[in-house]
Amino acid sequence: MLSLESEVLTRHLPLFANKSILLFGDVRDRFADQIKANAKSVAVFSSYFDYARQYADVSFGLYCEIKAELAVFYWTKNKQECQYQLLQWLSQVDVGQEMLIIGENRAGVRSVEKLLEPYGNIAKIDSARRCGLYHFELQSVPDFDGKKFWKSYRLQDLNIFALPAVFSSAELDGGTQLLLSTFNKADRLKGKVLDLGCGAGVIGASLKQQFEKIKLTMSDIHAMALESSRHTLAENALDGTVVASDVFSNIEERFDLIVSNPPFHDGIDTAYRAVEDLIAQAKQRLNRGGELRIVANAFLPYPDLLDKAFGSHQVIAKSNKFKVYSAKA
């Protein structure tokens, strides 16, 4: 099934004929298969591991270094993330480079005009399926300084670092704050700990600083989150392993504690699949007596999922908006 963005692109198939093509940005479907027959070559790059891991021909990472005669960028809802990815890629190509930018109107794709106007000619060439399609030709190669995109803030004795579109990138959110308040020195936490959906690394770094003897693993699907967590650990002189994983897809070991402020937003829609998989599979990923501890908006239907997977659960902290759940293997 094609996304709305790709449906619009199918109206312009002649543009892809006999050219090397790069698809990157928020690619979520197999539009590549639609154009392979007539294109010279098709490459796909994604910063989202949940998508990239499904297909052998999709490259995953933070920096896209793939060159092509025509690039197609799928706009994301986060303007700064788009700016980061577009300028990073355009900084390494030549004047005359052609690009198409496609995105939903509700995701703010219109702002690409102001973003790219300083670097070349941009024009809207189609509007359909509540999306806008733009053609861009590079006239002035931009300078890309990734350091300018980093945000940081102080959390007690920690410095937290984050790239665009990473959760808790500007300040500590209320849910994570409540979750962290449930840990104290008296717990004497030890063993293997997994911070799943680590974002900027707030939870994992906080626990590692508080409980030095734990063996910490941090995981996320977003390349920007993984880089942010690595940076947070390094800048605070903390040890930990950071891995790309779609829930447990790339994690084989068992843990004594799995802790998470799991996401329930997917782009500009709400999605629960990752959380459902986390709760359903966590018991098999815990050592005997191990614990799953998560925080969530109070209205979300997690108690039933926890009881189904673990047999029971406890609410160990709550506020007007959030609840912290604990379930033990």
UniProtKB/Swiss-Prot annotation:
Chemical reaction(s) catalysed: guanosine(1207) in 16S rRNA + S-adenosyl-L-methionine = N(2)-methylguanosine(1207) in 16S rRNA + S-adenosyl-L-homocysteine + H(+)
Enzyme Commission (EC) number: 2.1.1.172
Gene3D superfamilies referenced in this protein's UniProt entry, alphabetically: Vaccinia Virus protein VP39 (3.40.50.150)
Sorted UniProt keywords: Cytoplasm, Methyltransferase, rRNA processing, S-adenosyl-L-methionine, Transferase
Subcellular location: Cytoplasm
Broad class of where this protein is predominantly found: cytoplasm
Molecular function GO labels: 16S rRNA (guanine(1207)-N(2))-methyltransferase activity; nucleic acid binding
Gene Ontology CC: one annotated term: cytoplasm
Subunit architecture: Monomer.
Assigned protein family: Belongs to the methyltransferase superfamily. RsmC family.
PANTHER family in UniProt: RIBOSOMAL RNA SMALL SUBUNIT METHYLTRANSFERASE C (PTHR47816:SF4)
Function: Specifically methylates the guanine in position 1207 of 16S rRNA in the 30S particle.
Protein name: Ribosomal RNA small subunit methyltransferase C
Organism from which the protein derives: Actinobacillus pleuropneumoniae serotype 3 (strain JL03)
Gene name for this UniProt entry: rsmC
